[in-house]
Every structure is written in structure tokens, then in C-alpha cells.
């Protein structure tokens, strides 16, 4: 025997009714099937609206007409396909139900209230019509059926009409006494049962699910399947957390805990019957029948992560009741729980407090007024004689819970939870982990709820080394960086590294997608974007997201962006950049960036500031960390000038060599910036500061390559034309050096006293810079450890590929 229950989203239209009928047929494999159905679509909600509008003397005709229209359309659409359908019989059932509904609503209108007995009759109407329609479909397909009337067969324990529980023993006897033939498909409306007087009552929240598990026990079934609109139970609400993972297996205890603490799955009352009788239950997706679903049983596969899921309850209020004397609290607590229980107010959990004379507990917002009333009544004398402080209620809270199989015995989980919340600056108002060994619950402000849930889920379940990259500047280097990430996709995946491009900005446009920008469409999306990069806008966009390793990658040469680095760091971002402006501005800002990074425990990597892809900065730092000291430095620090001066050796003119360097991408858009020597001076300043010299850019002496009259030329074409005037001068200098067995090189020098100079130098064949050309950089460090032969770093110091690879390397250094 197998029980199949289908919810309202599985029965919203004729296509879904046929689809459900097919699922039923596919399950008729050597075992009997029993079906429990909810009302179609949003029928129950419409019925609730009709009741409330009637009480408030509002026009209900449109609501009733909508309900009637929905059902008539449903059976008409079914009849168009299933000609054998008992159409007139179903139509009469619908008309009779609607007539009964109208009469009941008329009575409510006269009373100006709705007794629970009447409410139960009205809100359960849809389930009976679902059964009538499905029964007719199955009969038209040649199947024999038996319908169980839950009002006659399921006996409830209490006299309540709206939230009843079922007496399983008597109900089971009644149903088994029906002696239903084995070849019959059994159908039963969900959500309802009968009291001792034989009156219809409802089973509360998730009532149809409860009906299914009760029927499973009553029919001695081997499996209960709950068919809904999701693939099963997830590690978190997939509507809130896009990468929530499907849980294929749960224990009964875990399922109860998840449900109790906010997961939108089965209600705890639904699980208790199958837990007691050890009946497995699988949650399946009507729209995706092939999905494995989530199986709840006593033989579940244990979660390797130890943690089952993260749940949340919104609209929670926290009550705090304090005694003046700690000895009185022991007499107060039973009174509190007794009056709350009698009033059927659900205490979600009690809270640990540091004070021994205070008890705190959480309830749902909807019960707050009732709770205050019953508490003031129960504790009247204590409050009157001021043995208690006034009852304190803290509102607008969210309860976040982490469910684990054995959380109390695993302190690492608790430590991780608080570490993650601290990382995103969420203040914990209260903690509870004593009520159950399977969960820890944290009370936070409502505004922190979504961020807290996302942060905990990502921090707990993300097993990859993840970085969220916000790329500013999408010129040649920026585009090459993106290309390299795409090309290394398989390697990154093999190392469990997830680099998500979450933002891309140029001088005009900005796109943002915290789930990751599609690398194939970024150009189109950026061009279509009407937003420009604004750091405040970025912060507003990410405030409800937990970013594991957010990295600003600044591929601009923009001073304004560089001036925001401290703000980036203080807001939780690492920084990777080839932009030299931040490291070559005034010494105070240079120092403040490093202090901010140290304080916030963030990385500020700028390896590409000096040698593009060459590992210059980190190697220099390693030397100094191990006690080495710099005696002398000499290097070719410009790929463009390396190329140009190399071409001069090949008897190519200065102007022609500069044009070639520009066409190959070695120079800035205007080559004047390269030939001014300022770029080399900036790199030299960065190296000098790394060594410990507190210098400013003005302290670097630059031997200008160009006469002063070149400074006013902004047009690139005009500049190249004007440059021809210097061709002969440089040709003569090359010849002069050649006669001496030397070559011209444009170098940066740091001497032992920290004096820095940028100049054209004549180097002989013993100099490590002698053979450097074609865009190569070479840096010779003479130190206490490396002399008389220096440590030389040599390689291409310009070009899109090597610069982008240096940026890529810095990003990976943050993760690895």
C-alpha cells in the first residue's frame, strides 16, 4: 500500500489534473494506491477572503463568481479531453457546493461573525470537489475507486473545529472495517475529519499532509508520498538562497526540527504519525516526477556536512519577564507556560539569559496581543505588588536556526555560526541551544534576517574557495583578465575554486549580478546598462548578501578610484590592482591603506604595479622578511621603453620605434606618458617604499627624455610627428655608446642611501641590463645576501597577457 498526496499547486488546472492522474496510473505497480487531494490552486485562500469580506460587510459576489468560474472552467477543459467524464454529476456537485457556500456566507453576513464550525465547512469545500473531479477521471479511464469520507472515518480527539488532531486507533479500526477491495484506487479529501458528534472539522496548517500521514498509518502503508511544487526539502529556502542544496535523506527528528523552526515543508504534526509507526515519507515534485525527492525515514543516510540546513522565522516577538528576586523565578515559570498552553499560544523557544531572574521566550507576532492579555491576567498579583518588572516585548525580530544531527556536542559548529555572523556585522540578540540537541537558534533584528540566513548558508555549505570579483576598468587588460578566467575554468573547477564575476564597470556603465555575470554576454549587458559605477550603489546592492571573499579588481589608472581604496577595505573588500596611483600618492595615504587592510584583515595586492606579471613585490618582501637589506637597485621598469631602446640598437628611429611600441600595445594610449619617465618614477617609488624609504614622488629625480615643449602636445598623431625632431639626437647617442662597447638603457636606480633616480644609462656587457630589450623588464637587486652577483628578475613587464596573469595570480593568492 502506498499513499500519494497532491497539493493545491499540483491541481491548478486541467493539464495538472491529467498529469496527476498519469502519476497515479504509473504507481499502480503490484500495490494498492490511496490518494489524498488538496483544493485546486488558491481555492482555500479565496474562501478565506470570502469569509472575511462577508464579516466586514463587503461585496463578495466577485469572489464567489471567481470560485465558480474556476471550477467550471476546470471541468469544461477536462471534458474536452476526457469525453467519458461524468460531467453532469461533477457540475451538479459544484453547483450544490456553491449553493451551500452562498447560504453559509449569508448566515455569516447576518451574524457579522463566523463561528469556527461554519468556517471549517467553508474552507474545506475545495478538497471535496478535487476528489469528485479526480474520481471521475479515474473512472472514465476504467479504474475502480473507493472514496473514504474523512468526517465519518477519521475521529478527532478534541472538540475544536479548526486545528484538530486525529485519534489514530479508532480511525484505523473504522477504515480497515470498510474492507476496501485490493484492486480499488482509494481516494480521500484532505484537511478534514469528524468529531464525536459527526461534525466536520479541519486539521489546521498543512492539514492535507496530516491527512495523508494519518491515512498511511490507518491503511498500514509502506510509503507515503507528498507531491508538491518543489523537488523536496532543501538546505535553505531556495527562494531566498539560490544555491540551496536538495536534501535527499532526512531523519524524522531532522524533518521535525526543520519544520518547527521555519522550513516550509511538512508541519511537525504531519511527521509524528509516520515517525511513531516508522513509515517512510518522500516529498516529490509533481512538475518533475523523475527527481529523487527527499526521503524522510529512520534509515536515512547521514549528512556528511553534519549540518542539515538553515531555517528562519520572520515576524517573531521576544518576551522578557524579570523577577526582582531570583528565587521567585522558579514559581513564575510554571505559571507562564501554563497560561500560554491553555491559550494555545505557541512558544517557539525559550532563550538563555545571563540573568538568573529573567526568562525570555519567542512567539509569533500574531499571538502577541493574546499573550500579553493572558500573561497580565495570570501574573496579576506579581505585577501589582511589583515582584515582577513590567513585561518587555521586543518586536520586529527574525529567528535563524542551524539544524545539525548533534550540535550540542560539536562546538566547532557553534563557533562557525558566530564567526560568520560577526563577519557580516550582525548583532545576536539572543541564543537558544538547550531545547534540542539538534539545533541552535539565534534571534536577530528583522532587518538583519535575510543577510544572516544567506551568510550562514553560504558559510556552512560552500565548500569551494570562492571569490566575488568586482572589476573596475574593462580596457585591454581587464578584458584579458576575464578571458583568462574563462580559459582556466576547468582548472579552477578541479581545484574547487569558484571565481564569480559579480560586477563590471567602465567609465560610463556598470552591471551587477551577485550570482555571477554571464561571461558570454557581459559586453552586451554593459552597453545596455544605464547605471554608472558608484560605490554607495554597490554597497546598497550587496547589503543583504553574504560575500565570502569580495575583491575589487581595479584595472584603471584612475586617481579617484584609487582614493576610495580605504573605503573599499573598510567595507570588507580585498583589493587587487595594477593601478599605481594609490601607492605613489602621499606617504600618509600609502600608510593608511596598509593600516586599514591590517585592521580589517583584508588583502591589498599590487604585484602588477612594478613588473606586470613578474613576481617583484612579493620576492622583495620575502627578502626583507628574512633579514636581508637592499644595498643597491638598478632596473629596467618599463616594457615600452625596453622595446623602444632595444629598437634604437637595431638602428630604428625613436619616432618609428615608438609607433611600433604603440601598435603592439606596449605604450599608454598617448606614448608621451611613457616617454615622460613618470611611469618608471612611480614604479621606482613603490620599490623604494617597500624597502622602507619614506619618499614622495617629487623626491625621484627624472632625467627627461623629451624637451619641455613636448609637454603641451595632447594629440597623439601630432606627438609622433614632433618626435621625429629627436630621431637624429638619439641616433647619435646610440652610436656614441656603441663605440664604447655600451648600450643605452632607460633605468631606475636606488642607492644605499635611498636616493632614487630615473635616467638614460650607458651599460656595458657585464651589466645584467645589457641584453634587455623587446619589452622585457629586468630588476637587479644587490643586497646583503645577493652580492656581488645580484638577484635578477627578468621577463616581460608590459602587455595585456602578462599584466592580466599577474592580476589573476594576486586574486588566487587571496584564496590559496
From Swiss-Prot:
Subunit structure: Homotetramer.
Residues that coordinate or bind L-homoserine: 668, 679
Ranges for region Aspartokinase: 1-250
Chain sites annotated for binding NADP(+): 477, 508, 556, 580, 665, 668, 799
Name of the encoding gene: thrA
Entry similarity comment: In the N-terminal section; belongs to the aspartokinase family. In the C-terminal section; belongs to the homoserine dehydrogenase family.
Catalytic activity: L-homoserine + NADP(+) = L-aspartate 4-semialdehyde + NADPH + H(+); L-homoserine + NAD(+) = L-aspartate 4-semialdehyde + NADH + H(+); L-aspartate + ATP = 4-phospho-L-aspartate + ADP
Cofactor note: A sodium ion is seen in the structure; a metal ion may subtly affect the relative position of the nucleotide-binding region to influence enzyme activity, and could increase the stability of the enzyme.
Ligand binding (Na(+)): 607, 610, 612, 614
Keywords: Amino-acid biosynthesis, ATP-binding, Kinase, Lysine biosynthesis, Metal-binding, Methionine biosynthesis, Multifunctional enzyme, NAD, NADP, Nucleotide-binding, Oxidoreductase, Sodium, Threonine biosynthesis, Transferase
UniProt-recorded Gene Ontology molecular function terms: aspartate kinase activity; ATP binding; homoserine dehydrogenase activity; metal ion binding; NAD+ binding; NADP binding
Region of interest called Interface, as start-end residue ranges on this chain: 251-471
Coiled coil residues, start to end: none
UniProt-listed InterPro entries: AceGlu_kinase-like_sf (IPR036393), ACT-like_dom_sf (IPR045865), ACT_Aspartokinase (IPR054352), AK-HD (IPR049638), AK-HSDH_N (IPR041743), Asp/Glu/Uridylate_kinase (IPR001048), Asp/hSer_DH_NAD-bd (IPR005106), Asp_kinase (IPR001341)
Catalytic residues in the record: 683 (proton donor)
Enzyme Commission number(s) of this protein: 2.7.2.4, 1.1.1.3
Protein name (Swiss-Prot/TrEMBL): Bifunctional aspartokinase/homoserine dehydrogenase
Binding site for NAD(+): 477, 505, 556, 799
Amino acid at each position: 500500500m502506498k499513499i500519494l498526496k497532491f497539493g493545491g499547486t499540483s491541481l491548478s488546472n486541467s493539464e495538472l489534473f491529467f498529469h496527476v492522474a498519469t502519476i497515479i496510473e504509473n504507481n499502480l505497480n503490484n500495490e494498492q494506491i490511496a490518494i489524498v487531494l488538496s483544493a485546486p490552486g488558491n481555492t482555500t485562500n479565496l474562501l478565506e477572503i470570502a469569509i472575511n469580506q462577508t464579516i466586514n460587510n463587503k461585496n463578495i459576489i466577485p469572489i464567489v463568481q471567481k470560485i465558480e468560474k474556476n471550477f467550471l472552467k476546470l471541468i469544461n477543459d477536462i471534458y474536452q479531453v476526457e469525453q467519458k467524464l461524468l460531467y453532469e454529476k461533477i457540475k451538479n456537485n459544484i453547483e450544490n457546493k456553491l449553493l451551500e457556500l452562498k447560504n453559509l456566507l449569508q448566515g455569516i453576513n447576518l451574524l457579522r461573525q463566523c463561528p469556527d464550525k461554519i468556517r471549517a465547512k467553508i474552507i474545506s469545500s475545495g478538497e471535496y470537489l478535487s476528489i469528485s473531479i479526480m474520481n471521475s477521471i479515474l473512472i472514465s479511464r476504467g479504474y475502480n475507486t473507493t472514496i473514504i469520507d474523512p468526517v465519518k472515518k477519521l475521529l478527532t480527539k478534541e472538540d475544536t473545529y479548526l486545528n484538530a488532531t486525529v485519534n489514530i486507533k479508532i480511525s484505523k479500526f473504522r477504515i480497515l472495517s470498510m474492507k476496501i477491495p485490493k484492486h480499488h484506487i482509494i481516494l480521500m479529501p484532505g484537511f478534514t475529519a469528524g468529531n464525536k458528534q459527526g461534525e466536520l472539522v479541519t486539521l489546521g496548517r498543512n492539514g492535507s499532509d496530516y491527512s495523508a500521514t494519518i491515512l498511511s498509518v490507518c491503511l498500514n502503508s509502506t510509503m507515503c508520498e507528498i507531491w508538491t511544487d518543489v523537488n523536496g526539502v532543501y538546505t535553505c529556502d531556495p527562494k531566498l538562497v539560490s544555491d540551496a542544496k536538495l536534501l535527499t535523506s532526512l531523519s524524522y527528528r531532522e524533518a521535525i526540527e526543520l519544520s518547527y523552526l521555519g522550513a516550509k515543508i511538512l508541519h511537525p504534526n504531519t511527521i509524528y504519525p509516520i515517525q511513531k509507526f516508522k513509515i517512510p515519507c518522500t516529498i516529490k515534485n509533481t512538475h518533475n516526477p523523475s527527481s529523487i525527492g527527499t526521503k524522510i525515514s529512520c534509515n536515512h543516510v547521514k549528512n556528511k556536512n553534519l549540518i542539515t540546513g538553515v531555517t528562519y522565522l520572520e515576524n517573531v516577538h521576544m518576551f522578557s519577564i524579570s523577577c526582582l528576586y531570583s528565587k521567585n523565578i522558579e514559581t513564575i515559570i510554571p505559571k507562564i507556560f501554563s497560561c500560554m498552553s491553555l491559550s494555545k499560544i505557541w512558544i517557539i523557544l525559550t532563550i538563555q539569559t545571563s540573568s538568573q531572574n529573567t526568562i525570555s521566550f519567542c512567539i509569533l507576532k500574531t499571538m502577541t496581543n493574546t499573550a500579553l492579555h493572558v500573561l497580565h491576567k495570570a501574573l496579576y498579583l506579581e505585577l501589582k505588588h511589583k515582584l515582577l518588572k513590567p513585561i518587555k516585548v521586543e518586536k520586529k525580530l527574525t529567528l535563524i536556526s542551524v539544524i545539525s544531527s548533534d550540535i550540542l556536542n560539536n562546538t566547532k559548529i557553534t563557533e562557525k555560526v558566530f564567526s560568520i555572523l560577526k563577519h557580516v556585522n550582525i548583532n545576536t540578540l539572543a541564543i537558544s541551544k538547550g531545547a534540542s540537541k539538534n539545533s541552535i537558534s539565534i534571534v536577530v533584528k528583522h532587518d538583519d534576517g535575510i543577510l544572516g540566513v544567506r551568510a550562514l548558508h553560504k558559510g556552512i555549505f560552500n565548500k569551494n574557495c570562492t571569490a566575488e570579483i568586482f572589476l573596475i576598468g574593462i580596457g585591454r587588460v581587464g578584458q584579458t583578465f576575464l578571458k583568462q578566467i574563462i580559459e582556466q575554468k576547468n582548472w579552477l573547477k578541479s581545484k574547487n575554486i569558484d571565481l564569480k564575476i559579480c560586477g563590471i564597470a567602465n567609465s560610463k556603465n556598470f552591471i551587477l549580478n551577485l550570482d555571477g555575470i554571464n561571461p558570454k554576454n557581459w559586453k552586451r549587458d554593459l552597453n545596455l546598462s544605464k547605471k554608472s559605477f558608484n560605490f554607495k550603489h554597490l554597497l546598497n546592492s550587496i547589503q543583504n548578501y553574504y560575500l565570502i571573499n569580495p575583491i575589487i579588481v581595479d584595472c584603471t589608472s584612475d586617481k579617484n578610484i584609487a582614493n576610495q581604496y580605504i573605503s573599499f577595505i573598510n567595507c570588507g573588500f580585498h583589493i587587487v590592482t595594477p593601478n599605481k596611483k594609490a601607492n605613489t600618492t602621499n606617504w600618509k595615504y600609502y600608510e593608511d591603506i596598509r593600516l586599514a587592510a591590517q585592521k580589517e584583515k583584508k588583502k591589498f595586492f599590487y604585484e602588477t604595479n612594478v613588473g606586470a606579471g613578474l613576481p617583484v613585490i612579493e620576492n622583495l618582501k620575502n627578502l626583507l622578511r628574512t633579514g636581508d637589506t637592499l644595498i643597491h637597485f638598478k632596473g629596467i621598469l618599463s616594457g615600452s621603453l625596453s622595446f623602444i631602446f632595444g629598437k634604437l640598437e637595431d638602428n630604428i628611429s625613436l619616432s618609428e620605434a615608438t609607433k611600433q611600441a604603440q601598435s603592439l600595445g606596449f605604450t599608454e594610449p598617448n606614448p608621451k606618458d611613457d616617454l615622460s619617465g613618470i611611469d618608471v618614477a612611480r614604479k621606482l617609488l613603490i620599490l623604494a617604499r617597500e624597502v622602507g624609504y619614506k619618499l614622495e614622488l617629487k623626491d625621484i629625480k627624472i632625467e627627461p627624455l623629451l624637451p619641455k615643449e613636448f609637454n603641451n602636445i595632447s594629440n597623439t598623431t601630432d606627438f609622433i610627428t614632433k618626435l621625429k625632431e629627436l630621431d637624429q639626437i638619439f641616433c647619435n647617442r646610440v652610436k656614441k655608446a656603441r663605440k664604447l662597447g655600451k648600450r643605452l638603457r632607460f633605468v631606475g636606480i636606488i642607492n644605499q642611501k635611498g636616493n632614487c633616480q630615473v635616467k638614460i644609462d650607458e651599460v656595458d656587457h657585464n651589466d645584467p641590463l645589457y641584453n634587455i630589450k623587446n619589452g622585457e623588464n629586468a630588476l637587479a637587486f644587490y643586497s646583503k645576501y645577493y652580492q656581488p652577483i645580484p638577484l635578477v628578475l627578468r621577463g616581460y613587464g608590459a602587455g595585456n597577457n602578462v599584466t592580466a596573469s599577474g592580476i589573476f595570480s594576486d586574486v588566487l593568492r587571496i584564496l590559496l
